[in-house]
C-alpha cells in the first residue's frame, strides 16, 4: 500500500469524528466476493501469498475477514489467472450471483496456460458446501482468447463485471466469446440489464470494471 494514501481514511475519520477500523491486514477489494448471506469466497493464491501477510496463518487471516466483514463462512479456491499482477484476485475467477450460486471462468483450450488452473478451481467449487450443507450451483463462463500487450499476457476475464442497482457492466474484448459470455450473464441476472462494454483498451492496465470500482 502507498503510505500517504493509507492515511486518508484516518484523516477523514478525525475530521468528521467517526470511527475508523484498521484491519491490520494487507489485501485488496478484488480479493474477496460475497453471497450476501454470511459467506465470503477468496483465493489462496492471493491472500496466502507471502508478499502480503507472511506473519499470518490461514486461520488468522480468516479471523480478520470474519471480524472486518462480519461473515461467518469462508470458501477458498486455489488459483488465479495468468497475467493477474495481484497474484489471483477472485474477481477474475469466481463471483457469486445468488446466495447459493457462483459463476466461475473456464478455459476450454487444453493448450492454454489457464486450462489446468481453472479446472482445478472448478473441482474445488464442486466439493464446497454452504453452512447449511447445500452444494453450490455453478455456472461456467468462458474465457476470452488470450490478449497480449508488449508480449505480456493480460488478465482478460468476463468475470470482472461490476454489479450496480439496475445493471451488470461486463467487460468485452472484441472476441468471438463476447456474446456467449453476455448471454450467460443475462440468464444469471434476469432482473438487471446486462451491458457489455469494450474493455480492450482498459485491460492493459491489468484490470477491468470490477477492479476499477475497488
Where do the PLM segments sit?
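The feature marks the mature, well-folded catalytic cores of soluble enzymes
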Residues: 1-214
Amino acid at each position: 500500500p502507498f503510505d500517504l494514501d493509507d492515511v486518508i481514511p484516518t484523516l477523514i475519520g478525525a475530521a468528521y469524528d467517526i470511527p475508523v477500523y484498521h484491519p491490520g491486514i494487507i489485501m485488496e477489494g478484488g480479493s474477496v466476493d460475497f453471497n450476501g448471506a454470511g459467506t465470503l469466497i477468496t483465493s489462496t493464491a492471493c491472500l496466502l501469498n507471502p508478499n502480503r501477510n507472511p506473519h499470518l496463518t490461514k486461520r488468522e487471516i480468516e479471523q480478520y475477514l470474519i471480524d472486518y466483514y462480519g461473515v461467518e463462512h469462508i470458501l477458498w479456491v486455489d488459483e488465479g489467472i495468468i497475467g493477474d499482477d495481484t497474484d489471483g484476485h477472485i474477481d477474475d475467477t469466481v463471483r457469486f450471483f445468488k446466495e447459493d450460486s457462483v459463476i466461475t471462468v473456464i478455459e476450454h483450450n487444453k493448450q492454454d496456460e489457464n486450462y489446468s488452473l481453472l479446472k482445478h478451481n472448478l473441482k474445488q467449487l464442486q466439493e464446497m458446501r454452504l453452512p447449511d450443507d447445500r452444494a453450490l450451483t455453478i455456472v461456467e463462463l468462458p474465457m476470452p482468447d488470450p490478449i497480449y500487450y508488449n508480449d505480456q499476457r493480460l488478465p482478460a476475464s468476463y468475470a470482472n463485471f461490476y454489479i450496480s442497482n439496475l445493471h451488470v457492466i461486463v467487460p468485452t474484448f472484441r472476441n468471438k466469446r463476447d456474446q456467449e459470455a453476455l448471454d450467460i450473464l443475462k440468464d444469471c441476472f434476469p432482473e438487471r440489464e446486462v451491458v457489455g462494454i469494450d474493455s480492450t483498451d482498459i485491460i492493459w492496465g491489468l484490470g477491468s470494471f470490477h477492479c476499477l470500482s475497488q
